[in-house]
């Protein structure tokens, strides 16, 4: 649901503070706000986050609402991240040229692929913005994103889910101490397990879990 009351805001700040207290100052903490704040509430929230020094605050308000995003970026010391819903370098151009954020998050599935992500990263580099590829679709997106990340100087961090190819790749990606070993074999460096993929065709996924609802069950997705 949307965060639209001080009570909700205080509860979320407390959660971030609890995470910071648990992991200490040597672990980076990024906060994904998932467009759930109005510009006014987002301004209050990121100000409350400043003492906790998050790596970035992702999509505090709607990513297509450019003017409030720009105003927010200019009034806080918390780096603002956005871009997972933007398409091609032309879609990222206003974000970069007007410096609406500190971190760009192109998704390789729909930003235009490997070369387009590199172009977006180059645009960002000129404005001293970081690249943090978004990925919420599976290990193949991670494999493609880390190849781009390894070739750009302004790479910050790469998003990935719990699966790094287990049960889908013959040799899953390897994560150790927060780093993924870059595959060295041709292409994306992963070999799909066709039999495992065929066996997974009948798997189900609860799309309802991706939407927000108010306490009374009414639809609340933005």
Regions found by a protein language model. Give the residues of each.
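C-terminal extensions of enzymes
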Residues: 168-222
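Shared catalytic-loop signature of beta/alpha-barrel
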Residues: 47, 53, 64-187, 191
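Structural signal for hydrophobic packing residues in well-ordered secondary-structure cores
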Residues: 20-23, 53, 149-153, 201-204
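Metal-dependent enolase-superfamily TIM-barrel catalytic cores that perform enediolate-based chemistry
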Residues: 1-76
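Acidic-enriched, low-complexity/disordered segments with a strong bias for Aspartate over Glutamate
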Residues: 4, 10, 25-28, 32, ...
């Amino acid at each position: 649901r949307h965060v639209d009351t001080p009570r909700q805001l205080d509860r979320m700040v407390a959660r971030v503070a609890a995470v910071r207290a648990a992991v200490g100052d040597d672990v980076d903490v990024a906060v994904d706000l998932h467009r759930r704040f109005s510009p006014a509430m987002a301004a209050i929230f990121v100000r409350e986050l400043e003492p906790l020094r998050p790596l970035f605050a992702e999509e505090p308000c709607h990513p297509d609402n450019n003017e409030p995003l720009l105003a927010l970026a200019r009034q806080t010391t918390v780096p603002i991240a956005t871009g997972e819903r933007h398409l091609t370098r032309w879609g990222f151009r206003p974000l970069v040229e007007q410096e609406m954020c500190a971190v760009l998050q192109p998704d390789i599935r729909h930003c235009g692929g490997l070369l387009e992500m590199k172009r977006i990263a180059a645009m960002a580099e000129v404005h001293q913005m970081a690249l943090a590829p978004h990925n919420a679709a599976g290990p193949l997106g991670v494999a493609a994103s880390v190849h781009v990340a390894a070739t750009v100087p302004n790479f910050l961090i790469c998003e990935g889910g719990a699966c790094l190819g287990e049960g889908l790749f013959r040799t899953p990606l390897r994560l150790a101490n927060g780093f993924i070993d870059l595959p060295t074999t041709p292409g994306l460096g992963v070999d799909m397990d066709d039999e495992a993929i065929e066996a997974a065709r009948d798997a189900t996924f609860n799309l309802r879990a991706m939407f927000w609802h108010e306490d009374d069950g009414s639809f609340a997705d933005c």
